[in-house]
A protein has these predicted regions:
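Soluble FAD-dependent oxygen oxidases
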Residues: 1-501
Length: 501
């Protein structure tokens, strides 16, 4: 895929890939950035030392050894949707291992567990599971996102309240470690590695195969949406208060998925109900959200059709997932730390007056809870088991992201934080990476970070699998105040779980 000067790195990569020029690229290649690097966030320029496209786990292992021998960092890429370009290293000089060729799929019809290649995209996974017996698993809505990153960092989607996060479906992995060993990991084999991969995978290895538990596809489902125009931000604030009260009801069925999307055009309350239209109508959504401009409900009896509809909705919102200059922030909220009415009023007042610097911005509140909360926080590296809903805000610049746009999104988080009673450990969802966080690892992994650091030091002591916010080695100073607060929240969650679910 391009000529290069002869170095130990280039020679080693060529040898690892049997000299197949289609399976590697170096910076000397014409159109290297456009065709091979392909950064998702155009505001963060990154030039990897090499981009590779192995076809087997053995080739992945060989590339890891070559990179480690050269003293370089390694990061895997599957879908390539990292907000901070961590899948290409996050900074210059990493070796990228693109997993696009790892596409194998096999369903065991006796157990309904599937073996899935680490390079599989969510859209392909949905189709393959359907064709193998009308099976499904929880995952996000963007079909171009890769399972390799999604199921090793969290993996939330509309069906997560029913089935859990994507990583909760994972029962075994084949993973390439920093010393280039290929190992199997599960709850009984290499359990520490398995624990770490389920929430912080990119810091520990490259998953070349997943074994996942599947569920029968749901039957009839209802997709709903209620649109509200900007007319008055005070009106939108009242609608959001209604939504928060509704979704925080301990008796809310797990069949109900929902999100609030705030944008330049107004606000949308939308989601999916995993049940019949008759069941959905009993929720009386029309009465709960009066004053809407438009209201639509679509009944799906075809799982592929519903998942495709999710993807189309996301495509409209994200411009098809194309690379763009963007900035993003996130927060998490649990049932014990709901946003007070005054803070909601402050947020919408802020949105009304602030200079945003772009017309393409979104503030999204995604309902979580349900089955995701059933799993104890210490059971996997994924640490946001007490989350009721997530805030994700992002904006796209035209040509570049303006400073006013960055200030706008920072102000969203600041306004909410300042309006909270105090003492909250919000944390940040590791799938919504934010390179501006002062202590990203603590925000992402919370009380699980110390154990992750110990495992990291044991299996990757040279920190080969690294990006700017990956799990640091043991001994790296970590603040202790936030984790203590987090443990209080976990105890509260466990009490609430007995009452709520």
């Amino acid at each position: 895929m391009g000529s290069s000067q002869s170095t130990p790195l280039t020679n080693g990569i060529k040898a690892a890939l049997n000299g197949d020029e289609k399976l590697y690229a170096f910076p000397s290649k014409i159109a290297y950035q456009l065709e091979d690097v392909r950064p998702y966030n155009l505001t963060i320029p990154v030039k990897p030392a090499a981009v590779t496209y192995p076809k087997t786990a053995s080739q992945v292992a060989a590339i890891v050894k070559v990179a480690a021998d050269a003293g370089l960092k390694v990061q895997p890429r599957c879908g390539g949707h990292s907000y901070a370009n961590y899948c290409i290293g996050g900074v210059d000089g990493a070796v990228v291992i693109d997993l696009r060729h790892l596409q194998h799929f096999q369903m065991d019809r006796s157990t309904w567990k599937a073996k899935v290649g680490g390079g599989t995209l969510l859209g392909d996974l949905t189709k393959r599971m359907h064709d193998a017996g009308n099976r499904a698993m929880a995952h996000g809505t963007c079909p171009q996102v890769g399972l390799g990153g999604h199921a090793t960092i969290g993996g939330l989607g509309p069906s997560s309240r029913l089935w859990g996060a994507a990583l909760d479906h994972v029962e075994e992995v084949e993973v390439v470690l920093a010393d280039s060993r290929i190992v199997r990991a599960s709850a009984t084999e290499n359990p520490d590695i398995f624990w770490a991969v389920k929430g912080a995978g990119a810091s520990f290895g490259i998953v070349t195969e997943f074994v996942v538990r599947t569920e029968p596809e749901p039957g009839e489902c209802v997709h709903y949406s209620y649109s509200f125009t900007v007319g008055s931000y005070a009106t939108l604030a009242a609608t959001f208060k209604t939504w928060q009260k509704f979704v925080s009801d301990p008796e809310l069925t797990r069949k109900f998925a929902s999100e609030v999307i705030i944008s330049e055009a107004g606000m949308i309350v939308s989601g999916t109900f995993f049940g019949s239209e008759a069941e959905f109508n009993k929720l009386e959504m029309n009465k709960k959200f009066p004053g809407y401009k438009d209201h639509h409900t679509l009944v799906f009896r075809d799982w592929l059709g519903l998942v495709a509809h999710w993807g189309e909705t996301v495509a409209l919102r994200l411009a098809g997932g194309l690379a763009a200059p963007l900035v993003a922030k996130s927060l998490t909220f649990n049932g014990a730390d709901l946003i007070p009415d005054k803070a909601i009023d402050s947020l919408f007042s802020y949105l009304e007056r602030v200079e945003k610097g772009t017309l393409v911005w979104f503030i999204i509140f995604d309902l979580a809870g349900g089955a995701v909360n059933d799993v104890p926080q210490e059971a996997t590296a994924y640490a946001h088991r007490d989350a009721l809903f997530y805030l994700q805000s992002y904006a796209v610049g035209i040509g570049k992201v303006k400073s006013s746009t960055r200030k706008f999104l920072t102000g969203v988080n600041t306004t909410i934080r300042n309006g909270m009673p105090g003492g909250q450990d919000f944390g940040a969802y590791p799938g919504y990476v934010d390179p501006t966080l002062v202590n990203g690892p603590l925000e992402y992994w919370r009380t699980n970070l110390p154990r992750l650091q110990q495992i990291k030091s044991a299996v990757d002591p040279r920190d080969i699998f690294h990006n700017p916010q990956s799990v640091p080695l043991a001994g790296t100073p970590v603040p202790t105040s936030a984790p203590k607060i987090a443990m209080v929240r976990v105890r509260v969650r466990k009490v609430l779980a007995k009452l709520c679910f």
